[in-house]
Amino acid sequence: MSDRQSHDIRGVQLTDDSYVVEQSLIRSKYKAMDKAGNVVIRGEQKMFKLKEEFPFVDANDNKVSTVKAGGIVDVAGNYILKDAQTGEDIVVLDNDYSILQDTWKIRDAKTEAKIAEINSQGALVTIARNVVPFGGWIPHKYEISDQDGRNVGNIDGQFSLKDRYEIT
């Protein structure tokens, strides 16, 4: 990660304190919007890949990052976030799969030190989303904590046919 002190993605300016992430109804397509509704970043899953891959572009269609699965058909595994402009791995996203709770650990790609953790809130909601027909329509709620376990943000799902999250 050269001499960078942060885990920023070159070409992406995140200046608001909240964003909305919305998934397309049909495919694994996502867009993140700022408070004014402007698209900051968007991406879609590449089809027919053995390893899941999500390239992301900014509002001007410039490539900014890629998220790629570490393994084939990775239900509980890791994903690498790579800066498209520098080619550097930025962070590793570890998914600890459980029917009771969704947990993502975010680690520095170089040192492997834990940077943050994202945990779903409410085991019953997580079970319903995974088991009940149409359970995917139930909104998720997540808590984001830093490496010391302090709350630094939240992700609140909104009831919708497609996943829609407010990140604060």
What function would you assign to each model-found segment?
Residues 1-168:
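Intrinsically disordered, low-complexity proline/glycine-rich segments
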